[in-house]
Amino acid sequence: CITFLYTLNGKQLVTVENLRNGDLHPVQKAMVESDGSQCGFCTPGIVMSMYCMYENKVKPTNENIDKYLSGNLCRCTGYIPIKNSIKNMYNYKKNNSNQNNIITLLKKIKRNDIMIENNESRFFVHYNLKGLIKDYQKNKNSYLLVGGTDLALEVTKKRNNLKNIFYIGSNK
């Protein structure tokens, strides 16, 4: 929710709505079968955390479940049905019919350096260190951005206008 849009250049954004490929994704099926959702407010975040576990084939130990659910708050279920759904999600088969096409399309994306500006600020994305160093030296008093959980709050919560931001999370 605090990710700068520019940092998504050349990436696939997967949302809970995107998981369904003809049929529910295994994590969605597991949530339904285990009654893991009640009011639905927390469900998208929890399902996406489960999706990360599933896609990375993380063993559903109690420690891993707690780690992947951190940052998600559910006030209805008491977490037992959610944890049960995580333990059961590997019992469901995934429909992979679209995955190879997505991977092919992502590999075709040209990763060119970009600079986006408005009247007050500029945002740079560099994919090589040489270009980053060159532009950064020209723009002193700039901010370096990797993940953004600290810097993004300066914009979203404090409403500070950051003049020059260099995103280095895509740097090779």
Regions found by a protein language model. Name each.
Residues 39, 143-144:
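A residue-level structural signature of the nucleotidyltransferase/glycosyltransferase Rossmann-like core
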Residues 25, 151-152:
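Residue-level detector of functional hotspots within protein domains
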Residues 2, 146, 153-172:
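Structural signature of FAD isoalloxazine-binding scaffolds in flavoprotein oxidoreductases
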Residues 82, 150-151:
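Alpha-helix capping/helix-boundary segments
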Residues 1-130, 171-172:
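Signature of N-terminal electron-transfer/Fe-S-associated modules in redox systems
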Residues 106, 147-149:
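A broad, low-specificity signal for short, low-complexity segments enriched in glycine/proline
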Residues 122-142, 159:
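Noncatalytic alpha-helical scaffold of FAD-dependent oxidoreductases
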